[in-house]
Amino acid sequence: MNVLSYSINTLEGLYEISGVEVGQHFYWKIGGFQVHAQVLITSWVVIVILLGSAIVTVRNPQTIPTDGQNFFEYILEFIRDVSKTQIGEEYGPWVPFIGTLFLFIFVSNWSGALLPWKIIELPHGELAAPTNDINTTVALALLTSIAYFYAGLSKKGLGYFGKYIQPTPILLPINILEDFTKPLSLSFRLFGNILADELVVVVLVSLVPSVVPIPVMFLGLFTSGIQALIFATLAAAYIGESMEGHH
């Protein structure tokens, strides 16, 4: 009897999981355009968190740093080390860009696990981490593509395009294709990992609501930080590669 009751409860949990929908969106109509409201709302929240934390912490810097100031200085030093390792001695101008990518993705990823987005009801769909939406990750990847094209052109001028026929002109199609696959790999890697993490938590909460999800959520926080680091590191590596001209 207990086995039958457990089986029924399990089936009910699976039925609830089947009701979880992925891909519903809430739009604002502005003029003749449809604006993806979910992404904008959650992205604005993340930006406010970042700006608010920075302003509160560093608006009055101390000679003897406070804990908050120490934390932000550590983050800056960490981002500088990543940028210098991947880009080289000309890393300086790119620290703000790499840092912005890292912090935005990091806070966005963590917001999916730590902020109660689901208590805010929308007419369609529900709020989630900005990086849980393919529009956000593609936009970040395209910004990275623009950045490494700009880095290469500003360093070498039109001679930058000579890389497409190196070491032999036969590789021209492959070298061109490579520049399309870079943003694709960046965007889909980040999107897939964050979406999968949130779906796993939803499934486990539906099946075992009190015990299993907790360690999985901690694992999700860890992998979210790793994904932010991977994205920022690869972005810096692509910029350094375009400036150096080697693959």
Swiss-Prot record:
The entry's keywords:
ATP synthesis, CF(0), Chloroplast, Hydrogen ion transport, Ion transport, Membrane, Plastid, Thylakoid, Transmembrane, Transmembrane helix, Transport
One family from Pfam that matches here is ATP-synt_A
**CDD domains under this entry?**
ATP-synt_Fo_a_6
Where is it located?
Answer: Plastid, Chloroplast thylakoid membrane
InterPro entries assigned: ATP_syn_F0_a_bact/chloroplast (IPR045082), ATP_synth_F0_asu (IPR000568), ATP_synth_F0_asu_AS (IPR023011), F0_ATP_A_sf (IPR035908)
The Gene Ontology terms for molecular function here are:
proton-transporting ATP synthase activity, rotational mechanism
GO CC annotations, alphabetized: chloroplast thylakoid membrane; plasma membrane; proton-transporting ATP synthase complex
Name where it mostly resides.
Answer: plastid
Top-level taxon of the source organism: Eukaryota
Cleaved signal peptide residues: none
The family database entries (SUPFAM superfamilies) matched by this protein are listed as:
F1F0 ATP synthase subunit A (SSF81336)
Membrane association type: Multi-pass membrane protein
Q: Where are the transmembrane segments?
A: 38-58, 95-115, 134-154, 199-219, 220-240
The family classification in the record reads:
Belongs to the ATPase A chain family.
Subunit organization:
F-type ATPases have 2 components, CF(1) - the catalytic core - and CF(0) - the membrane proton channel. CF(1) has five subunits: alpha(3), beta(3), gamma(1), delta(1), epsilon(1). CF(0) has four main subunits: a, b, b' and c.
Per its database record, what is this protein's job? Key component of the proton channel; it plays a direct role in the translocation of protons across the membrane.
The record's listing under NCBIfam families reads:
ATP_synt_6_or_A
Q: What is this protein called?
A: ATP synthase subunit a, chloroplastic
**Higher taxonomy:** Eukaryota, Viridiplantae, Streptophyta, Embryophyta, Tracheophyta
